[in-house]
Swiss-Prot record:
Family annotation (HAMAP family): LeuA_type1
Keywords attached to this entry: Amino-acid biosynthesis, Branched-chain amino acid biosynthesis, Cytoplasm, Leucine biosynthesis, Manganese, Metal-binding, Transferase
Main location: cytoplasm
Gene (UniProt): leuA
The protein's name in its UniProt record: 2-isopropylmalate synthase
Catalytic activity: 3-methyl-2-oxobutanoate + acetyl-CoA + H2O = (2S)-2-isopropylmalate + CoA + H(+)
Assembly with partners or alone: Homodimer.
Names of the cofactor(s): Mn(2+)
Keyword Transmembrane helix: no
Source taxonomy: Bacteria, Pseudomonadati, Pseudomonadota, Gammaproteobacteria, Enterobacterales
Gene Ontology MF: a single term: 2-isopropylmalate synthase activity
Length: 523
């Protein structure tokens, strides 16, 4: 009988570590809701003790996500576990994931400890986590380079202490699939109480083997796979969840397992993660790349036309990549837009219908027809600019030519005041940025600029993603418009608002800290 493999998503924790700029709470919530809609069993959404921002994101997601188990990471440190529990307690049920290194190298050089001390610490911390929840995951960091006898000792002790999931990470992407399968098999042979926990795997792609290692582990008995959408993560990335999920579906004949994933949401979730994280998907990426279902060879094209199964082991429709519909125009009403969003699986609570419809009408007047991908871009990329604003683009105008110096005039609303500046630059975008810098006096340093067409043809929406440095921190901004210069200006204004919000959060934290200090003095 087919057994279920639990899908544990760590896009918002391990995946986010690879990003050039941190995501906002609202951006993380958007991704979390998409993952919930896709049907992931568990989502690891942050490391609460690491920062107030991470704590807030975990708490916000734990409060709103209902159909997936929300999890937070904690080292084998008392404060980590206590803070993780505090951030998660708003959820009806939650998981705490705690970890400690087990390989001889890590124990000796990083922890400066012994295996016996590591086991003792693991037991204590698992028991501490169990005081808060009956769902505790324990990870043996660098398990791939841990002798099997040592690993078995740690695993047995953690299960006895109350761990309900034991995670075996290939932390540095070192093992071969046959080796990794051997580790899982070895644990089943050596750990007497292994039937009391679910065995999980967490692989990295340093040698390009993350998916292969995860599937080999599943074949050997692992029943949870951890990974990130699009394989994002530190260094070469994490195990690509969409690849593992579809491999399990397509090769059920060999693996004899299944997942609870809604496969129709894979493509949409992948695209959303790519857009929000500002990480384009390579065209040749398995499952979700733009070329994944493209056939350019004449022989292949002929074979596909005769029977798609000649060269396709799965269909675009199986991951939710359906034919684009041309059913919305400037004459479409608000109800029609809502109906189309409903058909695509989006809840009204995930977007602002009034704002979406206003943006839709403006775009429809310019383009004539509005596609599904246009609606998604307006609803979710545009949504990032709907957060409370201190800065707002009021007006811009540029003059440039092949032999002229680019000049930009910009009006920016700064709180209640509207300010204007004119500046020259190396091209129209640079001129606009110079004018904005003069208005705000922030003097941000542009680190990355990318432009992506959202749609097809000359009237496609242009999405500009930028990363900028300010006071030693990196901030991400996104802008969306049919005009590239306007998209660029909106992206910079988004960065400025993110900087302003970060400063406001810092002020609030300082205010609370001072308030607590005053209360202590009073007592």
């Amino acid at each position: 009988m087919s057994q279920q493999v639990i899908i544990f998503d760590t896009t918002l924790r391990d995946g986010e570590q690879a990003l050039q700029a941190s995501l906002s709470v609202k951006e993380k919530l958007q991704i979390a809701l998409a993952l919930e809609r896709m049907g992931v069993d568990v989502m690891e959404v942050g490391f609460p003790v690491s920062s107030p921002g991470d704590f807030e994101s975990v708490q916000t997601i734990a409060r709103q996500v209902k159909n997936s188990r929300v999890c937070a990471l904690a080292r084998c440190v008392e404060k980590d576990i206590d803070v993780a529990a505090e951030s998660l307690k708003v959820a009806e049920a939650f998981r705490i994931h705690t970890f400690i290194a087990t390989s001889p190298m890590h124990i000796a050089t990083k922890l400066r400890s012994t295996l016996d001390e590591v086991i003792e610490r693991a037991i204590y911390m698992v028991k501490r986590a169990r005081n808060y929840t009956d769902d505790v995951e324990f990870s043996c960091e660098d398990a791939g380079r841990t002798p099997i006898a040592d690993l078995a000792r740690v695993v047995e002790a953690a299960i006895n202490a109350g761990a309900t999931t034991i995670n075996i990470p290939d932390t540095v992407g070192y093992t071969m699939p046959f080796e990794f399968a051997g580790i899982i098999s070895g644990l089943y042979e050596r750990v007497p109480n292994i039937d009391k926990a679910i065995i999980s795997v967490h692989t990295h792609d340093d040698l390009g083997l993350a998916v292969g290692n995860s599937l080999a582990a599943v074949h050997a008995g692992a029943r949870q796979v951890e990974g990130a959408m699009n394989g994002i993560g530190e260094r070469a990335g994490n195990c690509s969840l969409e690849e593992v999920i579809m491999a399990i579906k397509v090769r059920k004949d060999i693996l004899n397992v299944h997942t609870a994933i809604n496969h129709q949401e894979i493509w949409r979730t992948s695209q959303l993660v790519s857009q929000i994280c500002n990480m384009p998907i390579p065209a040749n990426k398995a499952i979700v790349g733009s070329g994944a279902f493209a056939h350019s060879s004449g022989i292949h094209q002929d074979g596909v036309l005769k029977n798609r199964e000649n060269y396709e082991i799965m269909t675009p429709e199986s991951i939710g990549l359906n034919q684009i519909q041309l059913n919305l125009t400037s004459r479409s009403g608000r109800a029609a837009v809502k109906h189309r969003m409903d058909e695509m699986g989006y809840k009204e609570s995930e977007y602002n219908l009034d704002n979406l419809y206003d943006a839709f009408l403006k775009l429809a007047d310019k383009k004539g027809q509005v596609f599904d991908y246009d609606l998604e871009a307006l609803a979710f990329i545009g949504k990032q600019q709907e957060e409370p604003e201190h800065f707002r683009l009021d007006y811009f105008s540029v003059q440039s030519g092949s032999n002229d110096i680019a000049t930009a005039a910009v009006k920016l609303a700064c709180g209640e005041e509207v300010k204007a500046e004119v500046a020259n630059g190396n091209g129209p975008v640079d001129a606009v940025y110079q004018a904005i810098n003069r208005i705000t006096d922030y003097n941000v340093e542009l680190v990355k600029y990318s432009l992506t067409a959202k749609g097809h043809g000359k009237d496609a929406l242009g999405q500009v993603d930028i990363v900028a440095n300010y006071n030693g921190r990196r901030f991400h901004g996104v802008g969306l418009a049919t005009d590239i210069v306007e998209s660029s200006a909106k992206a910079m204004v988004h960065v400025l608002n993110n900087i302003w919000r970060a400063a406001e959060v810092e002020k609030e934290l300082q205010r609370k800290a001072q308030h607590n200090e005053n209360n202590k003095e009073t007592v």
